[in-house]
Amino acid sequence: MSLIPSIFGGRRSNVFDPFSLDVWDPFKDFHFPTSLSAENSAFVNTRVDWKETPEAHVFEADIPGLKKEEVKVQIEDDRVLQISGERNLEKEDKNDTWHRVERSSGNFMRRFRLPENAKVEQVKASMENGVLTVTVPKEEVKKPDVKAIEISG
């Protein structure tokens, strides 16, 4: 195990992937003590897995604690999948004394450029146990018609 994080992110990411719209952050794997509040940590770092099956592109995002009403899935500009959400702070009572605040609040947004074979009009999304699953069906690859030509002579 290396003590220095990979400069290009996790094992499944590819800096040269033309479909990724993430901005590369060289400091994302370093855990520096900062004055940033907890609201900037969990949502800014919302992780999304993208796998391609023979039938579809499947996106899975871990967003624990959010209700489906607090999450939006949209297709922008015909080929950009946008996943966003927001969790608000709890209402404070003047008589309450907080000893620790670790649950995060704030918003997040992740964007992915979909490939040409995506059927953007048939996108489906579901959420279960804090995991959002977005399924984008793929166009069937039409195999070219092959015609055998007889060789004379």
Swiss-Prot record:
Cellular localisation: Cytoplasm
GO molecular function list: unfolded protein binding
Protein's GO biological process: protein complex oligomerization; protein folding; response to heat; response to hydrogen peroxide; response to salt stress
GO CC annotation: cytoplasm
Highest taxon above the source species: Eukaryota
Keywords: Cytoplasm, Stress response
CDD domains according to UniProt: ACD_ScHsp26_like (cd06472)
Keyword set includes rRNA-binding: no
InterPro entries (UniProt xref): A-crystallin/Hsp20_dom, HSP20-like_chaperone, Small_HSP
Domain sHSP residues, every copy: 39-153
Keyword set includes Cytoplasm: yes
Subunit structure: Forms oligomeric structures.
Family: Belongs to the small heat shock protein (HSP20) family.
Identification of the protein by name: 17.5 kDa class I heat shock protein
The species this protein was found in: Glycine max (Soybean)
